Amino acid sequence: MEIIKSILYFILAGIFEIGGGYLIWIWLRDGKSYLYGVIGAVILILYGIIPTLQPSNADFGKVYAAYGGIFIVMSILWGWKIDNIVPDKFDLIGGCIALVGVIVIMYAPRG
């Protein structure tokens, strides 16, 4: 159950980081209202809180290193579903490699 909860926190953090960053991106790059930037900034602050909900035995470095792998995969998915940029085989291979890293860093048994 802890692993499922941990993965859900990673996914939630990814949605907040990518979503908040995207709102700031379209504010500055696409000329949207400054409110997009404000909302994006608030979402990014919330993103910073979510990783603290990870299990207490996971230190900052491990959580953020593993989150990097999740971020890679979620960014590829965001580009595909939101910006209609279809990932190629190298994107998919790289995403799978990143997920293997997440599993090793966060969930490999240590003794």
Swiss-Prot record:
The chain crosses the membrane at residues 7-27, 33-53, 60-80, 85-105. The lineage of its organism: Bacteria, Bacillati, Bacillota, Clostridia, Eubacteriales. The keyword Mitochondrion does not apply. GO terms for cellular component: plasma membrane. It is found in: Cell membrane. InterPro entries: UPF0060. Belongs to the UPF0060 family. This is UPF0060 membrane protein Cbei_2176. It is a multi-pass membrane protein. Keywords: Cell membrane, Membrane, Transmembrane, Transmembrane helix.
